[in-house]
Amino acid sequence: MKVKAAPRAKARLTSARRTGARGFTLIEILSALLVLSLLALMSYRGLGAVLDAREHTRYETDKWRRVAAFYARFERDVQLAAPRPVRSTTATGSGVSPAWRGEASATEQSRLEFSRFAATEGVDTARRIAYRLNEKNEVELWLWPGLDIAPDTLPARYPVLAGVKTFELQYLNPGLVWVNVWPSSPTDPPIPQAVRLRIVLASTEEIVRIFALQS
């Protein structure tokens, strides 16, 4: 004998089946889209921050690599400074330039200029060189072809460090006093005891280094 389900139980079963087959409502779909949009935005911002950080790290690494290379070059040059004056000849006459001639601020109008021995590895010759800060905020290296050169011979100029606001030098005299020009008196030796170089980068970092010179 078959047992028939009660009408109330049958209604509950039909309602449950309808509820299980019901799709998402519009509000649920919009809520899901909003959550997905927020997740995508957060992911995009996170990726952008990572890329920005990587670019900043690359820029800083390159900047300090260039600064380190410049200081290495400057140190090598000043430690090869030669206590040898040079003959200077121009259209107005001839004279002698001191072995080391320096001012406090090596700008476009002034510069650090000195005689330099040949490099020990034989890759360069004895010559007159100079450093100065040009109008483009670049430290320039000037290279003359030798020591005693022909009249009005112009040096080759090479930018060796960009993005420099300040390029200042001081020189240590035999009394262990820092002076702003060299030679500062007729009794000064051809080369100072040391040179102090202060650089301020365009990004505001300040670097000060002291280089002992060969006496």
Report residues per predicted region.
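N-terminal single-pass transmembrane signal-anchor helix
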Residues: 1-2, 18-47
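Short, low-complexity intrinsically disordered segments enriched in A/P/G/S/L with frequent Arg
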Residues: 5, 11-17
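Residue-level detector of short, conserved catalytic/binding motifs and their immediate flanks
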Residues: 24, 129, 195
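Extracytoplasmic beta-strand-rich oligomerization domains located immediately C-terminal to a leader/signal peptide
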Residues: 42-147
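Short solvent-exposed loop/turn micro-motifs enriched in small/polar/acidic residues
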Residues: 122-125, 151-152, 162, 190-192
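Short, mixed charged/polar active-site loops
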Residues: 123-128, 155-157, 205-208
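Short aromatic-glycine motifs in intrinsically disordered, low-complexity regions
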Residues: 145-159
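Short linear sequence signals and composition-biased patches located at protein termini or domain-edge surfaces
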Residues: 161-215
